Design a protein with these regions (language model features):
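ABC ATPase nucleotide-binding domains
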Residues: 10-16, 20, 24-171
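Short, small-residue-biased leader/transition segments that mark boundaries at the very start
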Residues: 1-2
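Non-catalytic connector elements of ABC transporters
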Residues: 192-299
Length: 299
């Protein structure tokens, strides 16, 4: 592995690692686990016992476990064990911190709490941090820059909101978003976008072809005069919003989910259909073979 064009052995790379399995030494206390990397420092980096203790307590206080230093791993909760692992990675003052799915062993409440802690720690230490996760919500909430990968190949890099708003391909569009994007089979005819037999949007500049159409749940506007008709299955009240669950024969997934304002009164037709208009900036068109994004001309 090369760092700054210099071949370095693992202990000299300046990388702190935290994995899904925290790999704490069960026979050691929290203090001993955190101090362990410092005991292997050599040469000019070697520390005295007092220096190791001072740095270990400083890092423990940063991750808020300084009152747990005499406990052993089996006496800690999952969230506390995770903080010990982060402290052990930070104690060598790395140039880069790699977190490889560090939250996957925690329950939902602890995941949310620890996610905020990791953001705080990164801000306070200002260490470049690479956070690896399969959870798109974690990726969106914790990162300044997001890298979406598929089978080891980078699909898109950008700020989380930018990637969400402007996916380069269908994989990226489907990966980001809760609820997930709705995907339909569609067709471009005479520079118009059709879903089924309904013309839903203009698609100026795109040649006639079959396409995939991605519509974000918030991209629907309930409109009795709208051009896209869905078969209503149910509605779910979520406080300020209402989630409308419906179906469409051209939809790839079994259900179509749209999010609208809770004040909107939805009145299905006698055939149990609801009609929608679409927000153009929440609709994405993809080549059906390559699944790459197609861009209509903007007037």
């Amino acid at each position: 592995m090369l760092f700054r064009s210099t071949e370095l052995s693992p202990e000299n790379r300046g990388v702190g690692l935290v994995f899904q399995n925290y790999a704490l030494y069960p026979h050691m206390t929290v203090k001993q686990n955190i101090m362990f990397p410092l005991e292997n420092l050599k040469g000019v980096d070697k520390l005295t016992k007092d220096e190791m203790l001072e740095r270990s307590y400083r890092v423990a206080k940063l991750v808020q476990i300084d009152e747990l230093m005499d406990r052993k791993p089996h006496e800690l909760s999952g969230g506390q064990q995770q903080r010990v692992a982060i402290a052990r990675a930070l104690v060598k003052m790395p140039r880069v911190l790699l977190l490889d799915e560090p939250l996957s062993n925690l329950d939902a409440r602890l995941r949310l709490q620890t996610r905020e802690e990791i953001k705080r720690i990164q801000r306070e230490t200002n260490i470049t941090t690479v956070f690896v996760t399969h959870d798109q919500e974690e990726a969106m909430s914790i990162s300044d820059q997001i890298v979406v990968m598929k089978l080891g190949v980078v699909q898109q890099i950008g700020a989380p909101q930018e990637v969400y708003d402007n996916p380069l391909n269908l994989f990226v569009a489907k990966f980001l978003g809760t609820p997930p994007i709705n995907v339909f089979e569609g067709e471009i005819k005479d520079e118009d976008l059709y879903i089924g037999n309904e013309k839903v949007l203009a698609a100026k500049g795109i040649s006639d072809q079959p396409v995939y159409v991605g519509i974000r749940p918030e991209g629907f506007i309930y409109n009795p005069e709208g051009t896209l008709h869905l078969e209503l299955s149910s509605t779910e009240v979520m406080g300020r919003d209402v989630s409308i669950v419906s179906r469409h024969p051209a939809a790839i997934s079994p259900i179509v989910r749209s999010i609208i304002d809770a004040d909107t009164v939805v009145s299905p037709t006698a055939e149990n259909k609801v009609a929608f208009s679409l927000k153009p900036h929440k609709v994405f068109i993809f080549n059906k073979e390559t699944e790459e994004r197609l861009y209509p001309e903007v007037k």
